Each structure stands twice: as C-alpha cells, then as structure tokens.
Amino acid sequence: MKASFWHEKWKKREIGFHESVVNPALTDHWHALSAAGGSVFVPLCGKSLDLGWLLSQGVSVIGVELSEIAVQELFVSLDIEPSVSDVENFKLYSAENIAIWVGDIFNLNKAWLGVITAIYDRAALVALPESMRLEYAGKLIELSNCATQLLVTFEYDQSLHQGPPFSVPESAVQKCYGTRYQLQCLERKAVAGGLKGRIAATESVWKLSRNINS
C-alpha cells in the first residue's frame, strides 16, 4: 500500500476512519498501559481526538502521520499553535507535550523520539495489508524498545471487504508480536451495526507486554 493512497484519502475527504469521539477502547483500558507521566507513541495518528484525551491525562504525545493535512487539522482542533520545522525528510509539528512527525513511519529515526513509555495503536496495524505487518511491527519494536502496547484490531470475513481496515485475527497479532510480547485480550465484542455498517465483525482490544527475555 503506497503513501499516495492515504494522501488521496485526505485530499478527497474520504476519512470515514476518523472517529468523532474519543475511542472507548482507550478510555476504558488506559490504565493497562501504566503510562502516567510518561510518553505515548501513536502511529498513523491522523487527527484523532484520542490525542487530545491523552494530553488531558498528563502524558506527552508523540505521533507520526503521512498526511500534513491531517496534522494541521489536528492542531486546529486542539487549539494549539505548533512550531513547524524540517528534520531530514520529515516535518515536525510540535508544542508543549506533543510532537507529530509528518512522513513515513518506516523512515522515522529512533533517536528523534526519546524514551517511549507506551504505544497506542487504534488505527495503524489494521490499516496495513498483511504484506506490510511484520515490517511495521518490527519498526515499532525498534522505535520503542518493546514498550507496552494498547492495540485495537478487527476480525471479519476479508472476502466481504478489501480493507482498510483489514481483518487482523489473533493469529496475525501472534505472528507480528508473539516472540517479543505477551499478549492479553482485554476485551472482545461485536462491532455495533457491523463494520462499514454492513459487515459482521469483532473488535478486540489487546495489551501487549514485553517478554522478560526480549
């Protein structure tokens, strides 16, 4: 899946993936991350309202997003005037306790981010086709040194919808993270009204904790 796919989505305002409320998976299971006073990394963050909620919890937020349109709209929604700078092939939008990198997550440099206490992945893993997931998971592990994750996935009959969001069953989560993390399913429930309003689907919320030996 090319970056141009997501740039086009934002240009055409085809952003049904953007939620108009803070995601309940975050508010209900935030405590599982034990990230109070730390920094939370949000991959493929878009202009999610979840970022403002995280800031309200007193943590620093670090995000990465391909679309500069999304990042500009994020700061408008937060009513924050960011400082904008160029860092190699990224643009960095930053303000007190928040730093959003505009560019390809696969090119992000660990040294730029500092210590990551936890990861919140609501919309990143499910946005990637199977062929990209292992590389993505490896990048998160590299950037965060296996920081604890709160991960949201969907499972449904992939033949009914080409994605994104893609179906990511438990076996796929295990394949991506099972060797480095202990996986705990915190919640599993049917998607109310179905995925895209028509496809029976299950939403799962996972806590990923670093294996002692990883």
From Swiss-Prot:
GO terms for cellular component: cytoplasm. The keyword Transmembrane helix does not apply. PROSITE patterns: SAM_MT_TPMT. It comes from Teredinibacter turnerae (strain ATCC 39867 / T7901). GO terms for biological process: methylation; response to metal ion. One of its GO terms (molecular function) is thiopurine S-methyltransferase activity. S-adenosyl-L-methionine binds at W10, L44, E65, R122. It catalyses: S-adenosyl-L-methionine + a thiopurine = S-adenosyl-L-homocysteine + a thiopurine S-methylether. This is Thiopurine S-methyltransferase. Belongs to the class I-like SAM-binding methyltransferase superfamily. TPMT family. The gene is tpm. Gene3D superfamilies: Vaccinia Virus protein VP39.
